Amino acid sequence: TKQITGAKSAVNVVYKCAQLTGNYNFEHHIDYSPDYIDTYVERLPFEYLDKKEFNVLYAGITNVPPIEDRKLFYGNFYEDTRNPDEVREVFRYGFSYVPWTNYDKKKIAQIYNEYNLLDTLFPVTRSCEWNEHVGGKDPGIEHCGNCWWCHERQWAFGRLK
């Protein structure tokens, strides 16, 4: 994860999922580096796999909203790099599972609603990727409300918390 707050949130989400399902039969690995770089994060799962430290990597990456909707978001980072209409592989490299990669956050919000998770799981999840370029005070484990990811969350769920 890029930020220590992401690692803290991941623990909260996994714990809440275990509580809600009654399933505690898993191992949860988190890797946090204050010197985060994309190449490190891309390489790390292969190192764990080589050491037989896990069998599968689950990632919660979602698709981006339609271009016309995300033009309203701060920064509009993905307009040139991600096409919301492109169908992406859900299972990659023989061990990486990205089940939500072809669904935008509005679809995820529908799933939360369908399974009555808006008042239980949603409050412990976090989308914020605040950094000094966004401005304002570091929100810690809360949401800044100003970054692209907070705008996406608000767009999909109609709220941040």
Q: What function would you assign to each model-found segment?
A:
Residues 1-161:
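Nucleotide-activated chemistry modules centered on ATP-dependent adenylation/adenylyltransferase
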